[in-house]
Amino acid sequence: MGPIDTSQRLARLRELMQERKVDVYIVPSEDSHQSEYIAHCDGRREFISGFTGSAGCAIVSMTKAALSTDGRYFNQAAKQLDSNWILLKRGFENMPTWQEWTAEQAEGGKVVGVDPSLITAFDARNLSETIKKCGGSLLGVQENLVDLVWGTERPARPSEKVALHPIEFAGKSFEEKISDLRKELQKKKCAGFVISMLDEIAWLFNLRGNDIPYNPVFFAYAIITQSTADLYIDEEKLPAEVKNYLGDKVSLKPYGSIFEDAKVLGQSAQNKSDGEASTKPPQKFLISTRASWSLSLALGGEKNVEEVRSPITDAKAIKNEAELEGMRACHIRDGAALSEYFAWLENELVNKKTVLNEVDASDKLEQIRSKHQHFVGLSFDTISSTGPNAAVIHYKAERNNCSIIDPKAVYLCDSGAQYLDGTTDTTRTLHFGEPTEMEKKAYTLVLKGLISIDTAVFPKGTTGFALDAFARQYLWKEGLDYLHGTGHGVGSYLNVHEGPIGLGTRVQYSEVAIAPGNVISDEPGYYEDGVFGIRIENIIMAKEVKTTHKFGEKPWLGFEHVTMTPLCQKLINPSLLSDAEKKWVNDYHTEIWEKTSKYFENDELTRNWLKRETQPI
């Protein structure tokens, strides 16, 4: 998708900034719940900049505008930003961070404004300090200025119905989860926990929604104390079945009343603290480090609030047996769907010489997936990319702006689905003609990295930060690399990107150790701008493994892969694989055949394709 002219939007925004005596205005990607994926009504950064990627921050001064994003989106942003914008490439040498660039624009006593509901309290403090060093100041602007520019064209906030997530898939009742949470709160001697992250609320109450595309969550807040559980949600979203399910164990309150109630709680905590002996530390409310500045301020700020990594995030990341079994089951069905799709696509392109574009193909994949048990929808927008488009890491094909699939070029498909029993995310790179030697080399080096993570054995306490290099080592030896993380946590019929664990160089991945029950993607890649892109992605689950020795008496961990989709035999150069790696590929393909071939007893086309693609190398 090419650039749109943002001149009028920026001019109107600058008028509003001038009226409010704001010199620089920040437009984050996130919504008021700090969601990575957002509802259309919260797409403020996309509206003002024209950049449609899921990550980034826009900064507008009276004379300049900048967009900062990470390596996944450099190519996309360069294509989508018009001449009004400067692209700040995050992580590039000699390139300022968006915070540094903002501070530069604030030199000489200028005021930087931001909607306090769209930035975390932690980030607001750090940003304020950075700006102060340049002589500027940070101001929370309660009225969102981009919303005013957007006006009546801004989409309405979704209000979809909420549904129960059955215990057979959740594995634990919401009463048990709240009880576990209260034990954690008791350990921390706090007054309660104010929850703002949407996936945490959905997980805690065993509820699912449809307010954000691809993410089965709903707009809500919650406050849990030792004696109360309050859910802040628009009541019309709750069917009678859900209200009966929650019963008298949960008090329902209007979504919009959270900030007033937070102010009351904050004042109450302060009054209680003031009235007690000074030797007794005051009980604070916990909020996530991802909670908004607005929420922190409503509770009374730092004197009443302790920011922590959410105990719900930690609990949610360790899947129980029902969730793990669901992930295994849904990936078998999803693998069958992908095999059917790839067999169909090859037949159409090679045998029938059908002309298909990238969107035609992704639509067919969704149609095939939708036939399978427990299918709800996609878990993200399918990346269906041919040739040079595959080098755009988060490429998005549009109906009126996409390419015809070239059977003589690399085809990269990164896709996933939401099933009642789990969430999938799989990437396969294929070639329907004769790949070049460089394409085969790149694919095989990426495959070696994937196998290295899959077969890794490591002591308890090891982080995803430490494991990341396992996946890159073979590319590094050739002077190659990729500009994205190696893996992210995956939810159980929840967000496809889930913290706090992952594989990569982000600071957060050095803070939390991999633990049994974690579900993570394993997705190394390699990209040549304007030529081709390679990525292979499996979902893996951490587990305890037996070792010959047990140094330090620690448990040792490894992974179980659950993705059941064949690799592309045509792109593998066996001479670059060790005997152990060849055995891994052959064993993996045997497992795929055994688990998915039953779906094709009456589908000769797919069965023959699957048989061919799972032959020993």
Swiss-Prot record:
Cofactor: Mn(2+)
GO biological process assignments: proteolysis
Catalytic activity, EC: 3.4.11.9
Keywords, alphabetical: Aminopeptidase, Hydrolase, Manganese, Metal-binding, Metalloprotease, Protease
GO cellular component, as recorded: cytoplasm
Database matches in InterPro entries: Creatin/AminoP/Spt16_N (IPR029149), Creatinase/aminopeptidase-like (IPR036005), Creatinase_N (IPR000587), Pept_M24 (IPR000994), Pept_M24B (IPR033740), Peptidase_M24_C (IPR032416), Peptidase_M24B_aminopep-P_CS (IPR001131), X-Pro_aminopeptidase_P (IPR050422)
Reactions it catalyzes: Release of any N-terminal amino acid, including proline, that is linked to proline, even from a dipeptide or tripeptide
Cofactor: how and how many bound: Binds 2 manganese ions per subunit.
Residues involved in Mn(2+) 2 binding: 414, 425, 537
Entry binding sites for Mn(2+) 1: 425, 523, 537
Family indicated by similarity: Belongs to the peptidase M24B family.
Protein name from the UniProt record: Probable Xaa-Pro aminopeptidase P
Organism for this UniProt entry: Ajellomyces capsulatus (strain NAm1 / WU24) (Darling's disease fungus)
Higher taxonomy: Eukaryota, Fungi, Dikarya, Ascomycota, Pezizomycotina
Gene: AMPP
